[in-house]
Amino acid sequence: MMQLSREERLLKVESMTNVRDLGGYETQNGYYTKSHKFVRSTNPGNLSKDEKEYLYDYGIRVQVDLRSDFEVDQQPSALKGYKDIEYYNINLLQSKNLNVLPSEVRNYHDLSGFYVFMLESNKEQFRQVFEIFYQHPYNAIMFNCSAGKDRTGVIAALLMDLAGYHEYDIVKDY
């Protein structure tokens, strides 16, 4: 296993932005993480047939969609039902929780308070996501939200921290 550059981690999927493999980083104990295991992305709703085949050939066999029911209804995943890819939808932005967003979170000048609130108010959903990861140790897993930033970024940061990535790599990837 070897270190991959940022360019080597980027998957070439024209209809999506922010699609990258989380593998190929050196961990704190000197090992390198495996590529073709976890891929973070934006919503794969507009994939062409060739792009679906590219992701399939890349090894994607599980998709964890972190979007709300409304977002999924507006633009369903093109990978849902494609070949033998398993699809899971775990809504990480429960609308019932957003209605009670504490004022201290609303008043933050950055998103850090929102991320903490998201973690605290969606513990069961985060558990479900990591349970899916645990159940598929040999499959490549793609996880996404709409833009591939906030919800996807939190999951990616947690995975990277669990795997022992250097903090600067976690921040840089985020």
Predicted ranges, named:
Residues 1-142, 154-174:
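Cys-dependent protein tyrosine phosphatase-like superfamily
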Residues 147, 151-152:
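Ser/Thr-glycine-rich phosphate-binding loops at phosphate-binding pockets of nucleotides
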